[in-house]
Every structure is written in structure tokens, then in C-alpha cells.
């Protein structure tokens, strides 16, 4: 019998209990208001429509059967179309807007019961790693937000590789 040396975990639905609602108008209203600070004046409906159009274009441009979107790249393209020329500024704003998007859409973010107790017990005997079908710009801050940073020797997030698992 082989000795178990490491244990792999998924993130959402295994360790983290999360609920989001990306249909909320507040998301697009908040982003539209934030964009005015950077000289971009759009109504929330325009923000929503453009976000989903760029997402669709991004998916169609990839040849994979299950393409992974890149939320930061969507917002970066959005900002480029709005005339924000500086790549540094676009990158920074894209990350902030992605975080706003997720933060406003999130109804719940919490650990499932006893997650830390179990991880503490397992960490004493095994190497722990995390593999998740997720966006790193959401997953990494959410790992920190619930206090799971420091438990895993390795964290693999699908968005780093541009692939996602089939539904």
C-alpha cells in the first residue's frame, strides 16, 4: 500500500462557502460610478453590456473546448476601448474593477465548519496543496480573506493557465 504524502483540495464548495450574484445591477452601477473618477462616463447598462461582449469575444478567440476567461483582461480591454492609454494604469484599474465586481456581487464568503481544525490536523502530517477552477484575481484575495493563506505549499489556479474544467 502506498503511503499518502500529500493531500489536494479544491477551494470553492470544498473549503470556502461562497455565493455570488452577477446579475445584480449594483455591480454595474458601482463600476460606472468608479469609472467617472478616471474620465469614463457610461451608464450601468452600457458597462454590463460591454463587459459581457468583451467576455464573449475573449471566449471565442480561444480554441479550447472549455476556455477560461480572464476577468482582469476583460476589464483591461474595456479600459483600452475607453481610451486609457497607459498599460500600467490600465492594469492597476483592471485589478481594482475586478475586485469591485466580485466584492459587490458576493453575498457570502465563509469557511465551511471545521475547515481550519481539519487543515491544522492534516498539515501536521501531510503536505497540502490547493487546485481550483477559478480566477486568481478572486481566489487569492479570498483565500487571504478567510484566513487560509499559509496552509498550502502549492496553489494552482486554472486562470493562470487559461483552461478550465468542463462543467
Report each predicted region and the residues it spans.
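Substrate-recognition element of Asp-dependent hydrolases with the DxDx(T/V) motif
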Residues: 92-111, 115-143, 156-158
Amino acid at each position: 500500500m502506498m503511503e499518502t504524502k500529500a493531500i489536494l483540495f479544491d477551494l470553492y464548495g470544498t473549503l470556502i462557502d461562497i455565493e455570488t450574484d452577477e446579475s445584480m445591477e449594483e455591480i454595474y452601477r458601482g463600476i460606472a460610478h468608479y469609472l467617472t473618477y478616471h474620465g469614463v462616463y457610461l451608464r450601468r447598462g452600457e458597462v454590463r453590456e460591454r463587459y459581457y461582449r468583451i467576455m464573449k469575444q475573449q471566449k471565442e478567440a480561444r480554441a479550447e473546448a472549455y476556455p477560461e476567461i480572464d476577468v482582469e483582461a476583460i476589464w483591461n480591454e474595456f479600459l483600452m476601448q475607453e481610451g486609457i492609454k497607459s498599460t500600467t494604469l490600465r492594469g492597476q484599474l483592471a485589478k481594482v474593477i475586478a475586485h469591485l465586481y466580485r466584492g459587490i456581487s458576493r453575498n457570502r464568503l465563509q469557511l465551511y465548519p471545521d475547515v481550519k481544525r481539519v487543515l491544522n490536523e492534516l498539515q501536521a502530517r501531510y503536505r497540502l496543496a490547493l487546485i481550483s477552477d477559478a480566477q486568481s484575481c478572486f481566489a487569492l484575495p479570498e483565500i487571504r480573506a478567510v484566513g487560509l493563506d499559509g496552509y498550502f505549499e502549492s496553489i494552482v489556479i486554472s486562470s493562470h493557465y487559461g483552461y478550465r474544467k468542463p462543467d
